[in-house]
Each structure stands twice: as structure tokens, then as C-alpha cells.
Amino acid sequence: MCLKDWLCAFCCLRLGCLEYPKNEKQPLVSGNNNQYKTYAVIDDDERNLWSSPHDLSHTEAVDDRMLQSWIQTRNQLEKDSEEWQKLNYEIYTLRQARREVRARWRRILEDLGFQKEAETLLSVTKQSTISNPKNMKRAMELLVKLSDNTTIFPAGWDLPVRYLYIMDRLICLDAVDDFLNIAQKKYPKTKMDISQ
């Protein structure tokens, strides 16, 4: 900015004397900035709740994809047809099973004294992350142990990855052992459950 421009700006003597050079509105770094966009996509996928951690090949768990597929198929069918009713029943059954599992987890958390925090602890989104990657192995082992020793999950269910995040939170709160003990008392596996 020369002296004339400075004086014009300072005194506001005439309009239009403060036109900025066009190159000032150009980006400082020119060229392809795709490396930043690629990084953001990878970061989102790594934190994606519905896939296995660090697995970039899919974005949802199998049961989520199956549910979405059923819903899309049902929406294309004629309402109240026999096939529509079957799909509607399957969708309802899967959603009800998920609600029951969530309610079991909530009851245990409330028994641990997390009455106000239970919903927050159970809330897992795509932005959720594992607090410490070192906890991942322990959280998975404890989730498998929970599945093997309790009926908190329905028989034949794959372990939902979203509960891995909750186990990680319980590890951070140092409440995971108490959670397992209460779960084993409230939802023990019977001999009949083991034989299935």
C-alpha cells in the first residue's frame, strides 16, 4: 500500500481507492490439496463406529447393513403383502432385540451407580473413539468374556462393535470388573444356554 492509498483509506476522501489487488484473495498454497481431504476421510473411517476399528473396507456392521437392506426392500414392496409383512416382522424383531440388549446394559450401569450417566455411557456415534488404543485388546477380551459368561447378548449374535466402545469407557472409569460381576449375577448362563 503506497502513501496515496494509505491517505485515501485514512481520510476516506474518495470511494473506490481501496481496491485490493486481486492476488490478495488467492490461496496462499496453490495446487492440489487432496492430501488433507484424504486424511479427513481416513480419520472419519477410523473412528467409524459401525465398522471394525481401522477397517476402511466398510462403514457399518453386518447387522446394520442387513437392517438397512431389509428396510429398503420393504419400502419397495406393496404394503401389507405377505413378503412385506415378513420383512416388517424381521425388522421389528431385530430392533426389539437391540432394545433389550441396551436395556440390560442400562440396568447394570444403573446398578453400578451411573443412574444419570447411563444414557451418556451407552451413547455411541460415528464420532466416538477408543480413548486409548492400548485398551482395545483388553476391551475386546472383556467383551468376549461377557458374551461367553452371560446372556446379555442373544444366542447366536455377533458381538456388536458399539459395545466395545462402552467397554473402553468402563475401563477408563475403572468400573469394568464391577460391571462384569453384576452382569454375571443378573444374566448368568444356564446349562441350557451353554449347550446351545
Swiss-Prot record:
The keyword Chaperone is assigned to this record: no
UniProt main location, coarse: membrane
The name this protein goes by in its record: Melanoregulin
GO cellular component assignments: apical plasma membrane; cytoplasmic vesicle membrane; late endosome membrane; lysosomal membrane; melanosome membrane; organelle membrane
Role according to the record: Probably functions as a cargo-recognition protein that couples cytoplasmic vesicles to the transport machinery. Contributes to retrograde melanosome transport from the cell periphery to the center. Overexpression causes accumulation of late endosomes and/or lysosomes at the microtubule organising center (MTOC) at the center of the cell. Probably binds cholesterol and requires the presence of cholesterol in membranes to function in microtubule-mediated retrograde organelle transport.
GO terms assigned for molecular function: phosphatidylinositol binding
Any GO BP annotation: melanosome localization
UniProtKB keywords: Cell membrane, Cytoplasmic vesicle, Lipid-binding, Lipoprotein, Lysosome, Membrane, Transport
Membrane topology per record: Peripheral membrane protein; Lipid-anchor
Domain of life: Eukaryota
Localization per Swiss-Prot or TrEMBL: Apical cell membrane; Melanosome membrane; Lysosome membrane; Cytoplasmic vesicle membrane
Family: Belongs to the melanoregulin family.
Gene: mreg
Keyword Lipoprotein: yes
A Pfam family per the record: MREG
